[in-house]
Amino acid sequence: MGIEGVLERGVVTTTADKLINWARTGSLWPMTFGLACCAVEMMHAGASRYDMDRFGVIFRPSPRQSDVMIVAGTLVNKMAPALRKVYDQMSEPRWVISMGSCANGGGYYHYSYSVVRGCDRIVPVDIYVPGCPPTAEALLYGIIQLQNKIKRNYTIAR
């Protein structure tokens, strides 16, 4: 039975988990945490060419209004406490996307004394987007992967 049969009867059945996860995937509000050149690609992805609004992705300036953090660029030791503080201010459920080689593992500056070798040492990361810098298409693919991950979550305890 296709959608036509469902619309004739006027009844759609689903589980509460699927309904909640569908709503969450359609309204991701990322907090921009741009630290270096990857932030330029993140801004490029938010522009009109890629139109992330069609996925329900609206960039928010405040951690209290967002549920996704995109860490884009080189994370240094001085910035690590600020990253953790912003992450703690986000409400549950929250997700983190690590964008670029520097955020993933230190990148080109891996052996520098002041660079954190991956933001996953400070906050739990859900999606890694590789590249130096990753393209806007790669970030868009990472957001789609995050939406797929959210769809597989169980919200209601069984």
From Swiss-Prot:
| Record PROSITE patterns | COMPLEX1_20K
CC terms in the record's Gene Ontology section = plasma membrane; respiratory chain complex I
Name this protein carries in UniProt: NADH-quinone oxidoreductase subunit B 2
Q: Which cofactor does it need?
A: [4Fe-4S] cluster
Q: Assembly and partners?
A: NDH-1 is composed of 14 different subunits. Subunits NuoB, C, D, E, F, and G constitute the peripheral sector of the complex.
Q: What is its main location?
A: membrane
Co-factor remark: Binds 1 [4Fe-4S] cluster.
Species of origin reads Nitrosococcus oceani (strain ATCC 19707 / BCRC 17464 / JCM 30415 / NCIMB 11848 / C-107)
